[in-house]
Amino acid sequence: MPRAESSSHEVTSTAIEIYPGLGVWRVSLKPAWGEPTGSPVTSSSHRALPPAREALAEMVPVAEPPIPLAAITGRLAQRGILVEIPLGSTEEVYGLGLQLKSLRQTGKKKTLRVNSDPIADTGDSHAPVPFYISTAGYGVLVDTTRYASFYFASHKAPAPHSQPPAEAGDWKPAYIATNTEDLYRTKRVSSFVQVEVPFESAVDIFVFAGPTMLDAVRRYNLYSGGGALPPLWGLGIWYRAFGKFNQREVLGLASELRAARMPCDVLGLEPGWQTKAYSCSYLWNSGSFPDPDAMIAELRRQHFEINLWEHAFVHPTSPIFDALRPVSGDLAVWKGLVPDFTLSVARDVFAGYHCKAFVEKDITGFKLDECDHSDFIASPWSFPEHSAFPGGLDGEEMHSLFGNLYARTMWNIFRERNFRTYSEVRSGHAFAAPLPFVLYSDLYDQRDFLRGVINSGFSGQLWSPEVRQCASEEDLIRRLQMVVLSPQALINAWMVPMPPWRQFDGEKNRAGELMPGWEALEGQARAVLELRMQLVPYLYSSFAQYHFCGTPVCRALVLDDPDDLANGMIDDQYVLGPHLLVAPIMTGQTTRRVYLPRGNAWILFSNKDFNTSQGAMRYEGGQWIDFEAPGLNALPVFVRENTLLPLAEALPFVGREPRFKLTIQVYGNAPADFKLYCDDGLSYDFENGASYNWLALSWRKETGLTSRLTIAGRPPPREDLYEIVGAEVVA
């Protein structure tokens, strides 16, 4: 790997436009004394897909870079290479991947270290990404897998000379802080971003043009290959079973969910399905699962998809241990191998086994756990930064890439079989947008989980604020409401045998004690899960926009209007799809402040289960309101005025051949339109450009609702995917 040399601090800069007119530039910083020995390990060299060049070409063409590329400079130091990037005096900065502790990064230092327990606002993250977005309408990616430190206008050089004392008439008392919060508050003090990339003497900087802030994010996602498009069933409800369940108990849970009319598409099995779990054998535990093929067949008969928990550390009893030993790291984790997924041999062995043992037997997804790093607090369980891998990476570089590499290895199994997966992964890095893997965490702070939904949209990531243990009935329902309005509606009940709506107290649940009056709570939970099922067509169309246009499914308000200063600090509201404003209520709140963005009016969402007492209230945009929530069915979700919102009949599962009966809710009196995405919901045939279509819905007060296919001569692969049964004027 290239190292900084003390003989010269000079760095040369070479800027090129990646594709003419498409708004992406690369600035290469290298030592003036010549090419460094070796090449830096980068995310771009291990990306899952090439750039979506045709989609980039459909964006607004950009002739000039959004910042002066010559102003991006570097210098070598003993610690590595230091990069300086200009930042305007009024610009604010967001991004850096899955940041759970803060939204705006201006004035802060962030070190992007992979960490399974990011408990402070330091930059540690399950999925850090060295990519930031400016309110001036551009994005910057520092293409490194090192634990880079970003200083966002937080430091500057001292004054070049002393200053005379103030004249008597000009004297002002010095400000003295009276509390530590004010004393150490982050402040902007310079006009540049400094990025320290340790150990390296060369680095590439990618600049993504807008012209808007959202356009810059879209360009980054499209340059990554376009956003993930999950199978339709992946947007249903997920339920991970108790970790100690055996085959009989898993089948009992499945039948119980169906009998109770609790919507569910995916059942996840936790560590107990394997003979060895820490590290993994990837062998069925025949004592608990004597006939997995029969279990899979029965679950499929009930229209469940099956998702298996695992991690990539390979136990000595695994059938693939010997084949992976030469292509693994030099240090073990839980006595298991750490495969080097940068090597095709390691990927082929690992994927080949999983394909034959599981995917060919109708396992349709995996939960890729423990692929981030140790928590740095209780146990250094993962491989250290000084580990060495046969592909040339050290442990630090591998930690940055491990989640992406692992997910790509598993994703390719399904791509080769032309069958979509939607899975989970606990780590990620740059260029991850195409990967159909959703991030999650063992942490559980409710506000952090909400912030994760918002921040993931800056960097081409998907995040699930999963539901696990709950402190009360209210806590369960409020967490369920947030998770059904996220990229993945996941109930992770691995710690309790009974569904949490029958007993939220973990100890009592494990003791088999039903909660008095559990039926009422189950009914409330069912209504929340059915809301998700109603929104599946809307969400699927939003994911299609993510894939084809790069528009995040969940995004911060500041992305839509960075000039509205109110948006810049809002880290507890987000836009879901094109038209929904979501402001989740935290446990314990009976009222909350909601900001309604300017530019249009907003109408409170309403259906038979939610906001029934308030009704479809209309509010002008550009104002704060106090939303009263006297009961758990009060849900602050607002619809942009003059929107068509397709709501499906709530089915018990989406399945592989759904037919959605749609009622189109009409919000507002002016003309409104919506495009529903149509394909088979299962395959990757949409990638060939001919196996999908858009169903355009239009509402005019005079003529009512009409629909048409937007691409003439191309019928959708499933002509019966949507059946419009009516329209409802809500407000």
Model-derived features with residue positions:
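Accessory, solvent-exposed terminal regions and/or long lumenal/extracellular loops of proteins
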Residues: 637-731
